[in-house]
Each structure stands twice: as structure tokens, then as C-alpha cells.
Amino acid sequence: MKRQLLLFIHLLPALLFAQQEVIFPDDFKTNALDGKEVTITNTLTLTNNYSYAYGSITLSDGPLWTPTEKNLPGVEMFNQKNKENQDNQITVKQGVYSFTDANGTCRIGQTVAKLTGTASYSNGKYTITLTKKPEFQCNERPITCEIEEDYNLKVVSFNVENYKGTNDVQRTKIVAALKAMDADIYALLEVFGNSSLNDLCTALNTACRTDQYKYIENSTANQGMACFIYNSNTVTPFRDLQKNKLADNGYLPDRKIAQAFDLKANNERFIVCLNHWKAKDNSYNKPDEYADTGDGQGSHVLRRVHEAEATLEFIKTVTAYFEDEDVLIVGDLNSYSKEDPIRVLEEGELINELQKYVPNEYSYAFFSNNSYATGYLDHSFATATLDAQIRYAHPFHINADEPDALKIGGKPQEDNMYRCSDHNPIVTFIKLGTTTGIESPSSSHPTIQLIGDPRNGYLTLVSNTDLALTRAEIVNIDGKIIAAHDTNNAGNTEKHFTLPVKSLACGFYLLRVYDTQSRCTTCKVVLP
């Protein structure tokens, strides 16, 4: 009995001061853990690294999403989701253990299991001071930007955050990012005029020891514009740059542009429609209809809705001008995935490629309503015909994930690509020319000749084979059949077909034509 008592007395300190296993946030609703050393058994996600340089970060039970990234706008929803985000945060102080990895960073999206430290309670909130070095996992810094799927075209859309060509560190970091992504086309935003664009393109060529990168001039104005740099070894611009003036307001057409490119490998064409829509800025006077209603969409949502509607109209214009139906719509739309402007595009039958491939990633992180939350402000959409040729789309996680202290002008300042901007670039991989859902003419398919002037209200289709034509379908750029015409006689032997087009609006169309063996080919038609 005496030996048992002595053993109990010997173990008493360990029993009194043993680490207590807890779950966050369930076990942190009262002050019962104050002063105790705890081990949080559930895996936590790093959601705020803004103050990492000062020795503290914020962890949560899973990622924190901007409310309208995952939910339809609404005042009640917005308030509820903000409260959930606020309640799902715990501040962690490093103590004698550093948060940073070998690269000197700690990234949003990293996870940690079995976090151990001393809990302190103040003003209704807990703070954990580490007593054991944490082991962070996941979301490591990316180095290259490739996929396993076969593709022949890579498009990068990227807000480069006020590039003026006057900051050597910014130039070095942006060029490092462009070089690492190795795109055929760079669709860039917030480049200040043609002189800054020339500066960036020249620096990219110098870094790559080549002269293959060219640019397309947009504006001489010293203000942020949308623009293109392209690899002249792989693509060639077709016709002139087009500006969307359907939502005109001063210089804003410089921020909404479109350009067609022909892929040299197979002469296939597609169009890039690049956009930078109105910001959510609430810092100055505005008409009442543009005010923040508290539903989560911020200021100027009606303006962005108008820009979305104008984009749908602009697509019709540029498909006719560039004579192709394959359109990629990219850019900083200043709208999260469930907000009204994005739904306008989706209801316009554009395909949201990021929601298709990586719905649980993000391009931007922002502190608002007492939480640092993530979502997509930058997007990749495609018309139905191009969607069939897209192999993948995703954000390149080099910026929004990194601590704000590493931004240009911060300390420490390194000449790598990480935190070269506040937005993650969006990369879209395309196998251009693979399929539009219609087989192209060949020796086993009829070749069609179009005769006549569509302004007269009809076209005549003529086949060069011995088989008669039986059916013609007119398809719009969204892949929908908007008109179909059959021969009245099942025993038809005619190799020509009269097709009425008087009721069709001006624009670009695909024409599917079938013969008596149900073989199909396609023609491109532009109605003036």
C-alpha cells in the first residue's frame, strides 16, 4: 500500500499537467481550457498568414470561403456565413517555434495535425502559444505549371497588380512567373499602357533568351489596361484587337478586349475575350443603385451585371468578326462564383471551367468582416464548342496563398515569382482542334460548297459526292440547333439543298449537313 501511494505521488505532477486532447472549435466555447496545455486532435487549416512576420497566424477547422463563393447572395446568408467564419478561427502564436518552412513562408491552405500549445482566454477568444513544433502539410509552393493530359495550347490570365515598368523587383518577379507558366498566350490585366507592355515583353524575351514573345498594342494611356503577350512560334494573331464598347465608360473599353489566334500546328482558330470588371470599391460617392446592399456582393454589382450582359453581346460580335465560334472568356471579374454577374454568364450558356475542374480552389484571399476568406474573383469560361476542347483549368497558387509581407515592397524581398501580385493566375489547357461534336470533311464524308448571297434570304448547299443531301442543321455558338431542314422526299437524289436563312440574326453559325448514309460534315457560315 505504501509503495502504491509513493507511486501515485510520483505520477501526480504528470497527471495534473498532462496535455489535454481537444477538438476545435467544439471544446473552445467556454473558458475551461484557459491556462492548460492542449493538443487539438482534428486537422486545422491555415486561413490567415497576414501577421506571420509578427509571430501569429490564424487556423480554422477547414478553409474559410467568402460567403458568396459558395452561396447565393442574400443579407441573412451573408451575416450567418460571416459569423460562422468568425467563430471558426483561432489565433496561434509561435513562441519559440517558427511557422515558416525552409523557403521562409507559411501558406494559406496548409494543414497541421496534433497542434499542441498553451491555451489562453481573453475577451471571449482563445489564443494558443506553441509548446511543440508544428508540422505543416499540403499546398506547397508550385514550381512548374503542367498537367498529365494532352494539350496543344496553354492560356494564362493574370492580374499583374499595377505593372508600370518602373520597379525592378516587380519586373523580375512577374517575369519569373510568366517564364514558369510557359504559356502560349498571356492575357494580362493592370498593365499601364503600351510602354509598360513593351517593357514586360522585352524583359520576358531577355529572361528566356529569345525574341519569340510579341505583344498586341492596346492603349497609350497611362492607366491599367487589358493586353496580350503571345508566343509567336506557336500562335499567330488573326485580324485586329477588338474592344467591348457595349458597356462603355471612359477608358474602360481598354479593360475589355478580344483577340483571335491561329494555332500554327494545325491552323485552328480560337478567340480570347479578356475582361477586367468594375471593382467592389466602396470608398467614394456613387449612385444609389450601385450602393452595397449588404447581400455579400459589395458595391457596383449592378454595374458588373451590365458588364456581364455586354460580354454576352460582345461574344456574338467577335465570333462574326473573327469567323470562329470557339471563345475563351477570362479575367478578373471582381465577382465571386455565386454572385449575379457570374450567373449571368452561366445563364448565357457559357461553361464555368474552374467550377467544372477545381470548384474548391481560389484565386484571391481578402480580409473582410473579421475573417480572411478565399474565393474566385478570376475566372475561365468557354463557349460550348471550345469547352469540348478544354482539358483542364486551375489557379497557379503563387500569390494569394503567400503572406502579404512578401509582396513587392515588403520584407524580406526575394527575386522569385511568389507574391508577385495579389491574384493567382488562372491557367487553361486546351487541345484545340480535337472536337466540336462534328466530324470534319474527309474522303468518307461529303464536302459542301455554299452558293448564293445570304442577304437574299437563302443559301444553296452543293455536295461533291454521288450521294444526295437529306438534312441541314444550323447551330449557334453555344452548340444549340436553332433551325433544321429536311428534304420532303425520302427517295431524294438531289446533291443540292436550298437553305432559308432570312430569319436568322447576323453572326457566326455552324452548318451541319447530312447525306443519305447519315454521314455528317460541317461548314462555317457568317451572316452579314
Model-derived features: positions:
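Structured beta-strand-rich core segments of catalytic domains in phosphoester-bond hydrolases
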Residues: 191-193, 197, 201-280
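Active-site-proximal beta-strand/loop segments in catalytic clefts of secreted hydrolases
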Residues: 156-163, 188-192, 216-221, 230-232, ...
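Extended non-catalytic accessory segments flanking core domains
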Residues: 18-158, 162-172, 180, 206-207, ...
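Bacterial Sec-dependent N-terminal signal peptides
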Residues: 1-19, 520
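Metal-dependent phosphoester-hydrolase catalytic domains
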Residues: 31-35, 40-41, 97-136, 194, ...
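C-terminal outer-membrane/trafficking sorting elements
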Residues: 439-528
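N-terminal, active-site-proximal structural segment of metallo-dependent hydrolase catalytic domains
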Residues: 93, 122-225, 285-313, 324-326, ...
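Surface-exposed intrinsically disordered loops and tails
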Residues: 61-102, 243-244, 283-302, 356-368, ...
